[in-house]
UniProtKB/Swiss-Prot annotation:
The gene is secA. Transmembrane segments: none annotated. InterPro entries: Helicase_ATP-bd, P-loop_NTPase, SecA, SecA_CS, SecA_DEAD, SecA_motor_DEAD, SecA_preprotein_X-link_dom, SecA_SF2_C. Keywords: ATP-binding, Chloroplast, Membrane, Nucleotide-binding, Plastid, Protein transport, Thylakoid, Translocase, Translocation, Transport. It is a peripheral membrane protein. It is an enzyme of class 7 (translocase). It is found in: Plastid, Chloroplast stroma; Plastid, Chloroplast thylakoid membrane. Its main location: plastid. The keyword Mitochondrion does not apply. Its EC number is 7.4.2.8. It comes from Thalassiosira pseudonana. One of its GO terms (biological process) is protein import. This is Protein translocase subunit SecA.
Amino acid sequence: MLKNPFIKDSGLNQYQPLINQINALETNLKTLTDTELRNKTFELKKRYQEEQDLNALTAEAFAITREASFRTLGLRHFDVQLIGGLVLNSGKISEMRTGEGKTLVATLPAYLNALTDKGVHIVTVNDYLASRDQISMGQIYRFLGLDTGLIQEDMAFLERQQNYKAEITYVTNNEVAFDYLRDNMASNLSQVVLPPFNYCIVDEVDSIFIDEAQVPLIISQAVETCIDKYIVAAEVAEYLEVNVHFKVDEKNRNIILTEQGTAQIEKILQVEDLYNPNDPWIPYILSAIKATALFFRNVHYIVQNNQIIIVDEFTGRIMPDRRWNEGLHQAVEAKEGVPIRQNTETAASITYQNFFLLYPKLSGMTGTAKTSEVEFEKIYNLPVEEIPTARPNLRKDLPDFVYKDSLTKWTAIARECKSIANTKQPILIGTTTVENSEMLADLLQEYQLSYRLLNAKPENVKRESEIVAQAGEIGSITIATNMAGRGTDIILGGNTTFKVRKQLYNILVSYKSKTNLTKLNTIFPLAIDIKFTSQKFLSVLNSLLNDPKFLSLSSTGILKFLNEIDQIRIPKITYQCSIKFLLNELSKFEKKNQTIDNKIVKNLGGLYIIGTERNNSRRIDNQLRGRCGRQGDPGTSRFFLSLEDSLFRNFGSSKLQNFMQNQLLDDLPLESNLLTKSLDAAQKRVEERDYDGRKYLFDYDDILNKQRNIVYYERRKLLESQSLRETILAYGEQVIKDIITLLKDPKFPKTNSMIEELFKTRLVSLNSDLNSLDSFELKTYLFQEFWLSYETKVLEFEICQTGLIRSFERTIILYYTDIAWKEHLQKIALLRDAVGWRSYGQRNPLFEFKEEAYNLFQNRNITIRHLLIRDFLHSFIL
């Protein structure tokens, strides 16, 4: 077997022997019937149960998956895709370029690891991709006798629980992480949805592990909030001037009040001290200024239905379930004049960094991981392997154009679009904000250019995948914020799937009324063009329009069915069969046109990518460039920049900016090696800063994570225990030991009130002087009193209802465990803020945080025991 000519990395050559084994099995597998191939799954499962060695099954499992893929989808894994699968199975990240078939690659290790019957999770970034991949790739798994699950945002509890039981489950990062937190707040095992973790494949791993790593996932509960202070602070902020009353640190998104600013605010508010702990104004003021000076509408958030919705700066998508913390969200609400929602306190939280490390086996795939490989390896212990492309890369990355100011840059982009549009070459323009995307859209309108707009606005988000999929159509111009539509392939000449569904939807809705039937041939000439099938198409359409069940469908019902048609393997209703036939006929026709359009666009140079600003990370820039040149297609990319871009403004050296100002003419761009190197250096500085921030978060959260794991482990044991008698007795005995230790402390007053308060009764034997009692005798006596009190309480509950005491014990332990953990999280958050300042005193903040967090955790355990035993002994039945 010859080696793949594109494999240059000697590290990948280690997989060649396995590739040879997989290919050698192909001929024999092709001779098997479908049933015989399916039975291979049960044979491999049996072998695994006997040998417990998954590595021994790798070659055969991969070969079986490839054959099943070819029989169900007509897709045969390339050798480089086999390498990608082997890399994933070895617990690494596969970097595969756009269009190289990452979704198909994941089926190889997923099938192999599903043979253990321990479950496989394939994690994607949104519900659409999870559903799409489960529908398409699920055909392979079902063919091989495996069941697949799908978790969606609006899924009910029982359905969610059932889908997690599948051998392979498709789910979003958001859903699986929040399900984990909710499971660890459950009051009984029947409320738990997740099985034990086994193997996880993360798609778009850089988006989840890096872009979203700094945002912890939080389940919160509302707390009383002083709404009026946010409103007043927002009004005060309007009277303050930048660089006079406050300074803006744009790099770190921070605000620093000047002495003049502090005095001015105290004068306006008529208070003596903004920092007064009894009536603090400073947090409200700082949040209000941040909301005004650092957070902008249609850039960092949008206003929708009288709510502030955050816009993800990396993807351009809205995040309706996220809120800024520390009062910032309320400050933005006050600024925009929308209803201010209550502050919240954390009931449970985890970062993606620590959540995904819970999986015993973890891997990921993306098109852009190499630039962040150090972070992947240091934090997640995930090496990155760059997988060669199946075909040579023909994309041309042209040098950046840099202009003097933003106006000149945007004008140049519009002119470039006008020039390219004349050739009919498709254009995809990536912008960094909603505001910029809409401004460019208005500019293109002035140039009389038609375009499709995709940004975080709700009316655009609904059509995200469709808009991105059609970005490769002849003559199309698509404006998209950052990486919106990620995961959707842009096919040169257009994507027939979306196009055909839209066409059929329009046909069905238009002709549902019988009065239109006489005009069928003239209004819909496309059907006549379908040569020998056109008459049959019209005949089926005519019968469909006379089907009462179809006519009862609303327009929304038709659209819903068309979107879900892939999930219906064998339609059982007549109108469904008819619609599926019409869709197939249209697809055949459109595929012929698409083949022609594909060749035309390739001859024009493929998709032309225009970047409107360098992002803070080279990885994000590469993601935009990677939208063109898929699977050996031609493509071109160029970035248009200005000296007013945030990267230049915040991280470019003053020497560079002065040089550029002198070199640049008003409306002409500049290309230079110095410029490129300077931009790369600026991006590297930002990447290092952002990495330090994520590493800082990880180091601190890792300490909390160890405590979280202990609490969740103990909590699960509580749920699984049939009886908690031993736990209650152990807690009670430890409480007594704690009290005796206190009583023996010379500084502690010698009184029996603490003991009597615990037992809620007067203990006769303690009337004598406590100093005269021996510790052992006192402990023995109190133990006996506690055991007696416990048995009395058990009897009291059992008389009322058999088994009631067991339920009560579980409830009270879980209640205090959860309350104490919630309070612990608040204290940890305050501690993290406080220790940061200690570096100024030449102390190590991380070391001190670790030490004090440990003490807080120990105190939490003591508090749980004392409160629990006290309330248990004081409890009574109403």
